[in-house]
Amino acid sequence: MASLKELRGRITGVKSTRKITNAMKMVAASKLRRAQMQAEAARPYADAMRRMMAELAMATRGEDAASLPRLLAGTGKDQTHLVVVLTSDRGLAGGFNANIVRSARQLVDTLVSEGKTVRILPVGRKGADILVRHYPEMITDRLAGSDGKDVGFDKATDIGSRIATMLDAGEIDRCTLVYNRFLNAMTQIPVQAPLVPLSVPENDNAAPDADTAQYEFEPDEATLLTQLLPRNLQVQIFSAMLESAAGEQGARMTAMDNASRNASKAIDRLSQKYNRTRQANITNDLIEIISGAEAV
């Protein structure tokens, strides 16, 4: 049985831990509000950009893939896939990083089983550390995440430039972005979003979207595609990074709230054990005193 001194030390230690987890929960909650506002503000722009690019791309159907921009049609082959994985630089966020890495590994394993060549570009230290252990020969580079700071568009520009450079050099044929889409503080959904080639609706007879139907393109669609495809790639990556940042803070706030609750329960259990031990010691002392008095 643990002594009273040991139990007091354990209670003090758990209380100190609870102070830390409570503080981290409050910090994550304050960051979550800002990150959520940024992610929600970026969604309409990214969605509108995606619809407009799909409208432009539909005008190029039937053309030879070799004559189209590679960011639109890829290289015309389906052999080498680049998988960009967005995770965080910091831990203590529950299953946030584990879930996205699991989704990325499922995608990579599926592609490998189909005989594809896979290259991985991890963004964020936590995901990179895991992926390097499982696929050391597939890692092309390791990029730092936002490290808890506001996500900058320059990071999305850098990632987009790397993808475009690899595509132009013929090093990859397709690219998929794996990230956590933010729903709320408790829910983040792993998403596998194709970046290259550009996703275009398959149904030629589908009614045009109310927004995209109003577009009139000047100059011609091909010229606009060449100019806008790099920007669209950057916008989609930036939007995903904002979603990931909001999801990270939501997951961390939830994890620290659960940790604080568990710490409180542990303190209650230890306090009960401490009181029972103290009462038992007092009872034993009384028995010894009474027994001694009777002996006299």
From Swiss-Prot:
Give the record's keywords alphabetically. ATP synthesis, Cell inner membrane, Cell membrane, CF(1), Hydrogen ion transport, Ion transport, Membrane, Transport
Q: Name one GO molecular function term.
A: proton-transporting ATP synthase activity, rotational mechanism
The question of whether Cell inner membrane is a record keyword is answered with: yes
Q: What is its main location?
A: membrane
Gene Ontology biological-process annotations: proton motive force-driven plasma membrane ATP synthesis
What Pfam families does the record tag this protein with? Answer: ATP-synt
CDD domains in the cross-refs: F1-ATPase_gamma
Q: Which InterPro entries match?
A: ATP_synth_F1_ATPase_gsu, ATP_synth_F1_gsu
Please give an example of a GO cellular component term from this record. Answer: plasma membrane
UniProt keyword annotation of Membrane present: yes
Lipid bilayer topology = Peripheral membrane protein
Question: Where is it localised?
Answer: Cell inner membrane
Subunit field text: F-type ATPases have 2 components, CF(1) - the catalytic core - and CF(0) - the membrane proton channel. CF(1) has five subunits: alpha(3), beta(3), gamma(1), delta(1), epsilon(1). CF(0) has three main subunits: a, b and c.
Q: What does this protein do?
A: Produces ATP from ADP in the presence of a proton gradient across the membrane. The gamma chain is believed to be important in regulating ATPase activity and the flow of protons through the CF(0) complex.
Q: Family per UniProt? A: Belongs to the ATPase gamma chain family.
What name does the UniProt record give this protein? ATP synthase gamma chain
Lineage of the native species?
Bacteria, Pseudomonadati, Pseudomonadota, Alphaproteobacteria, Acetobacterales
